[in-house]
Amino acid sequence: MIRLSDVVKEYEIGTTALKGISLRIEDGEFVFLVGPSGSGKSTIIKLLTGEIVPTSGQIAVNGFSLTNIAERQIPLLRRSVGVIFQDFRLIEKKTVYENLSFAMRAVGSSPREIKKRIPYVLELVGLEEKTDRYPNELSGGEQQRVAIARALINNPSTIIADEPTGNLDPARSLEIMRLLERINH
């Protein structure tokens, strides 16, 4: 579950990004945050991942209070939240398998867990035949599916997607949205 209560975020340059935002998202909900550029969507994502802290208000994600989270708890929070970025953020010099393995090793997964989980997740996103490919050998839609696989690889309870179809054509966008909806059910 995600809960924001009267959240305010002001940046040092005097810009107020969020003012008094309250929101509750229950487990299993599929929610879209929409709004024009500069409306605070990216700020909310950064708050939910612990990248930044609110100026005031309360934020809870998967049982973690982000208002006063201890530094040592941030890796635990990040394990429970998978993030899909608009620009994919894949490691260009690593294969699909290596990109996913890297994400698993970062949270302490064993080689055995890695070997078992990666084929399962690649099948889930329809990329089981692309395991040895590098990002530059994949289409934009395939790269986005690798980014989704990376978000899923550590079995998070929450997935946050920052404009997951922003760099894709309409057909690929629909494919990605259907994949995300299927994963949610």
Tell me what each language-model feature is.
Residues 87, 153-157:
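A short, proline-enriched helix->beta-strand linker immediately N-terminal to the Walker B motif
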Residues 134-138, 142-144:
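Conserved ABC ATPase signature
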Residues 94-101:
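Short coil-to-helix segment of the ABC ATPase nucleotide-binding domain corresponding to the Q-loop/switch region
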Residues 49:
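Helix-to-loop junction immediately C-terminal to a conserved catalytic motif
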Residues 1, 10-20, 70:
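A short, flexible loop at the N-terminus of ABC-type nucleotide-binding domains that lies
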Residues 159-162:
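Catalytic Walker B motif of ABC-type/P-loop ATPase nucleotide-binding domains
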Residues 57-65:
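Conserved ABC transporter NBD signature motif
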